[in-house]
Regions:
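Short N-terminal segments immediately surrounding and downstream of signal-peptide cleavage
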Residues: 1-8
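Short solvent-exposed coil/turn linkers within tandem alpha-helical repeat scaffolds
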Residues: 8, 21-34, 67-86, 97, ...
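Residue at a conserved register position within TPR or TPR-like alpha-solenoid repeats
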Residues: 5, 43, 50, 91, ...
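N-terminal, post-signal-peptide region of Sec/Tat-exported proteins
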Residues: 10-48
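Mid-chain, structured segments of secreted extracytoplasmic proteins
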Residues: 33-72
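Single-residue signature of alpha-solenoid repeat helices
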Residues: 14, 56-59, 63, 112, ...
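"A position-specific structural signal for the A-helix of alpha-solenoid helical repeats
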Residues: 1, 38, 42-45, 86, ...
Length: 237
C-alpha cells in the first residue's frame, strides 16, 4: 500500500499513513521499526515534484533527521545498507542544490567558493558510502551459491545483483558531479573525469543486456569525454 502511494505520487498521503501507523497500537512492531526509514524514503521521493529551493532544503532536513534516527537506532537492521544509500542520495541532492545556487547570477565569489567546498565534501562522502555499499553487496553475492535452487536465496541473490548494478552506476555518476566542482584545467578535475570515464566504460561492458543501465552509462561516458574536451570521443556515444 505504501509503495503504491509513493508510485502514484501521493507523498503527503504516504506520510500521513506512516504517522498513523507509528501511533497505532495494532501496527506490527517490525513495521514500526522502519517507519523512520520509510519516512525518509518518502520525503526524498517527493523532491521530484518540488521546485522551490527553500521547500527542497526543508524536505532534505526532515529526511536527514529521519535517516539519522534510523541509522542510529538500527545499526544491525537488514535495511541498513539501503538506508546508507538513501543518505548518499540525500548528500548528492544537497550538492546539486548548492551547484544551482553557484550558477545563479549575482552570487558573490566568496559564497560560490563556500558552496563548492560544501558540495565537494558532500559528494566525497556520498562516493565513500557507495564504495562501501558496493563492497558489502559484492561479499553478500559471493556468499551465495550462484547455482542455488533455494527460492529464498535465489530471490536474495537477484535483489543483491540489482543493487550492485545500481551502485556501480551511482559511483561514476557521483564522481562526474564531484569533478564539476573544480575549475577547468584543475588536476583534481582531470583525475576525477578520467576515473568516471573508466568506471562508466566498465559498467557499459558489464551490463550490455540491461538497456536502462547501459543507456545511462553511455550518457555518463559521453558527458565525461565532453568535459575532458574529447569531443570526438563523446560523439561516438
Amino acid at each position: 500500500f505504501l509503495n503504491e502511494l509513493r508510485n502514484q505520487g501521493y507523498y503527503d498521503e504516504a506520510l500521513v499513513y506512516l504517522k498513523d501507523m507509528e501511533a497505532s497500537p495494532i501496527a506490527p512492531v517490525t513495521f514500526k521499526d522502519i517507519v523512520t526509514y520509510e519516512r525518509a524514503k518518502t520525503l526524498l521521493a517527493s523532491l521530484a515534484v518540488v521546485r522551490e529551493r527553500v521547500k527542497l532544503e526543508s524536505i532534505l532536513d526532515s529526511a536527514e533527521q529521519s535517516l539519522d534516527l534510523f541509522i542510529t537506532e538500527h545499526r544491525t537492521h537488514p535495511l541498513m545498507g539501503e538506508a546508507t544509500e538513501l543518505f548518499a542520495n540525500l548528500l548528492i541532492k544537497r550538492a546539486e542544490l548548492n551547484q544551482e545556487q553557484v550558477d545563479d547570477e549575482g552570487v558573490a565569489e566568496g559564497i560560490k567558493q563556500s558552496l563548492l567546498a560544501d558540495s565537494r565534501k558532500q559528494l566525497k562522502k556520498a562516493n565513500e558510502i557507495f564504495g562501501n555499499v558496493r563492497e558489502d553487496i559484492k561479499q553478500k553475492i559471493l556468499r551465495i551459491d550462484s547455482k542455488t535452487t533455494d527460492p529464498q536465496l535465489k530471490t536474495m541473490l537477484g535483489e543483491y545483483r540489482v543493487r550492485y548494478m545500481q551502485v556501480r552506476l551511482n559511483l561514476p555518476q557521483t564522481t562526474l558531479l564531484l569533478a564539476g566542482t573544480y575549475p577547468e584545467g584543475a588536476p583534481e578535475r582531470e583525475k576525477l573525469l578520467t576515473e568516471a570515464v573508466d568506471e562508466f566504460t566498465g559498467v557499459r561492458k558489464a551490463y550490455q543486456a540491461f538497456q536502462g543501465t547501459f543507456f545511462l552509462a553511455t550518457l555518463g561516458l559521453a558527458e565525461g569525454y565532453a568535459k575532458k574536451g574529447n569531443i570526438d570521443d563523446a560523439l561516438l556515444y
